[in-house]
Amino acid sequence: MPENFGYISQVIGSVVDVSYRYTSGGLPKINDALQITHSNGKVLIVEVQQHIGEDTVRAVAMDSTDGISRGMKAVNLGRPISMPIGNQVKGRLLNVIGETIDGMKCLSYENTKSIHCDPPKFKDLSTSVEVLFTGIKVIDLLAPYLKGGKIGLFGGAGVGKTVLIMELINNIAKKHNGFSVFAGVGERTREGNDLLREMIESGVIRYGKEFEEGMRLGEWDLSKIDYEELKKSQATLVFGQMNEPPGARSSVVLSGLTIAEAFRDQSGSDGHDVLFFIDNIFRFTQAGSEVSALLGRMPSAVGYQPTLATEMGKMQERITSTKNGSITSIQAVYVPADDLTDPAPATTFTFLDATTVLDRKIFELGIYPAVDPLNSVSRILDPNVLGQEHYDTAQKVKQLLQRYKELQDIIAILGMEELSEEDKLVVNRARRVQRFLSQPFFMAEAFSGIPGVMVSREDTIKGFNMLMNGDVDYLPEQAFLNVGTIEDAIEKGKKLTALT
């Protein structure tokens, strides 16, 4: 097959125009990948986004355009960007175009899958409703996650979204033996490094004993990696970090999703229930808005791209459960200036089955995870799915916390003394409930000094029922902070009482 190529006619930032005026081949299709080779042999992949006139295409670069000039040859690969799939990607770190970035041996690209593909057909979708319990009290009780659903973690800067995502990866890998794909979208490179180290330490990614012993001594010797052990890893990481151009940041979600789909759709009994983590979905939107103006689109509200809902919908529609397996998506959503009405988080809301909202005021109280129990919702908080006892307990907790919220204005103006005895009891009990919604995390052990815990649904319901019934009103408030079960709170209460 003859090589189909054009010549670069214009470069503006990360957008490249390629002219086919003087070549015999036809124009590449939308989403086709073009390959540009520098004089030093370095390869740049660009993705076709628009046809301009009869003989020019406009493409978005997946890496820096430094060193690119007019007149350079751009070869049409005749296919979209494709990701390597199969067991070979377990435990590996990849970039947006499927290249390894972990310094280990290269992958085979014989078995690949396009990052642009259609969602599953309607007849292949699964309709079963199953709960994914996380071992985190506040989530399992008040906003439980649907297996195969889409979950959003909403919060401003620095309230704990990434720590919560890392805890969920750890808990679900341990509890459900699930496979995880993590897409790092426009976040700090340091966080990606921390995540990899945490995953190696917790056994989610397996580099082998010899490497792990060296890592504990401060070494990072890739020659010590056991590749047989690596194949037993339970996660793949795909990164398009904040120092990369917007093309990479907007497409890396699709790259990660493609790998997750491949694991879900494996034939026979190998079909997986996959967890797909995105940190941060806002950066996907932000990258799209950066590229949008360069592509000549008129910006819409607050400067976002006019195609925001379309781009989000295309991606979210692919995250679904089939009869062969499921993809449960957990998406961190940065909320600009803590404003949930901003178009980016507001558009994301419409696709989700459950939302976990992290609140700065709760964070400032020292309650971690800083989940807002009144704003966090789930469509499966239903007695037909969870059972009557779970549903009743959750509703009682929410009613108590709502009443406490209403009383806070009165307390701020008049003080506790002006409340009725009944309202004083509500306040004292609600403060205990609020603190009992906190929990020590495995991923925070290093800086909190408190061992992490997973709490079963039964223990969670039992603990909150005892709180609501007043069985533990005699314990000091501090006894309920950063404990797992109600038994842990009683034990801590005894120690605190003994100290006083």
UniProtKB/Swiss-Prot annotation:
SUPFAM superfamilies xref list: C-terminal domain of alpha and beta subunits of F1 ATP synthase (SSF47917), N-terminal domain of alpha and beta subunits of F1 ATP synthase (SSF50615), P-loop containing nucleoside triphosphate hydrolases (SSF52540)
State the UniProt keywords alphabetically.
ATP synthesis, ATP-binding, Cell inner membrane, Cell membrane, CF(1), Hydrogen ion transport, Ion transport, Membrane, Nucleotide-binding, Translocase, Transport
Q: Does the keyword Isomerase apply?
A: no
Q: Where is this protein chiefly located?
A: membrane
Gene3D superfamilies recorded: 2.40.10.170, Bovine Mitochondrial F1-atpase, Atp Synthase Beta Chain, Chain D, domain 3 (1.10.1140.10), P-loop containing nucleotide triphosphate hydrolases (3.40.50.300)
Q: Which domain of life is it from?
A: Bacteria
Q: One GO term of the cellular component aspect?
A: proton-transporting ATP synthase complex
Give the InterPro entries listed for this entry.
Answer: AAA+_ATPase, ATP-synt_VA_C, ATP_synth_F1_bsu, ATPase_a/bsu_AS, ATPase_alpha/beta_chains, ATPase_F1/V1/A1_a/bsu_N, ATPase_F1/V1/A1_a/bsu_N_sf, ATPase_F1/V1/A1_a/bsu_nucl-bd
UniProt GO MF annotations: ATP binding; ATP hydrolysis activity; proton-transporting ATP synthase activity, rotational mechanism
Binding residue positions for ATP: G155, G156, A157, G158, V159, G160, K161, T162
| Catalyzed reaction equations | ATP + H2O + 4 H(+)(in) = ADP + phosphate + 5 H(+)(out)
Membrane topology annotation: Peripheral membrane protein
Location in the cell reads: Cell inner membrane
Q: Which family does it belong to?
A: Belongs to the ATPase alpha/beta chains family.
The UniProt entry, under HAMAP family, shows: ATP_synth_beta_bact (MF_01347)
Q: How does it assemble?
A: F-type ATPases have 2 components, CF(1) - the catalytic core - and CF(0) - the membrane proton channel. CF(1) has five subunits: alpha(3), beta(3), gamma(1), delta(1), epsilon(1). CF(0) has three main subunits: a(1), b(2) and c(9-12). The alpha and beta chains form an alternating ring which encloses part of the gamma chain. CF(1) is attached to CF(0) by a central stalk formed by the gamma and epsilon chains, while a peripheral stalk is formed by the delta and b chains.
Designated name of the protein: ATP synthase subunit beta
**Gene that specifies this protein:** atpD
